[in-house]
A protein has these predicted regions:
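Core segments of cupin and vicinal oxygen chelate
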Residues: 2, 9-49
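Vicinal oxygen chelate
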Residues: 13-16, 71-121
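Short, flexible turn/loop "capping" segments at secondary-structure junctions
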Residues: 1-2, 65-67
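Short active-site oxyanion
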Residues: 6-7, 28, 70-73
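Conserved short beta-strand elements that form part of the metal-binding/catalytic scaffold
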Residues: 30-64, 124-129
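A short, local hydrophobic-aromatic micro-motif
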Residues: 4-6, 95-96
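Exposed loop/turn and edge beta-strand positions of beta-sandwich/beta-sheet ligand-binding modules
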Residues: 6, 35, 67-69, 111
Length: 130
């Protein structure tokens, strides 16, 4: 396995609940350290690390729900519209419905198709076509 140049490591309330959530979405467990309540997961070209909150962690302040305030993780998927249908059939609550947005990128107008869901810890996941 090759590691991405940037891999977010997210503090979570319950590592087992978090693993179940991400596995249902199609994420793969690459490895885990059960004694440390840590898991490394991947999905297509994205990678995440999750660690259950503990007193010895790198906690910069009080950690309360929702975690990740002000952050959303943009995850490019191969077919965002098909993935959206899958997420709907799994009965995940949609935070923001599938939308098409136009953005200026280096003088060119690009269309991004995206939708958002929220994980059990409060992190926003934005699935996109790019």
């Amino acid at each position: 396995m090759d590691f991405n140049k940037m891999i977010p490591e997210l503090s979570v309330f319950d590592i087992n609940k978090t693993k179940r959530f991400y596995c249902r979405l199609g994420f793969k467990i690459e490895y885990e350290r059960n004694d440390e309540r840590f898991v490394f997961m991947s999905f297509q070209d994205s990678q995440f690390m999750f660690e259950q909150i503990h007193d010895d962690g790198w906690n910069t302040g009080e950690l309360s729900y929702p975690l990740g305030r002000g952050i959303n993780f943009s995850i490019a998927v191969e077919d965002v519209e098909e993935f959206y249908k899958l997420v709907k059939t799994l009965n995940f609550e949609i935070y923001r419905e599938l939308t098409r947005n136009k953005y200026q990128v280096n003088g060119t107008e690009e269309t991004q198709i995206e939708f958002l869901i929220q994980d059990p810890n409060g992190y926003l996941l934005r699935f996109t076509n790019w």
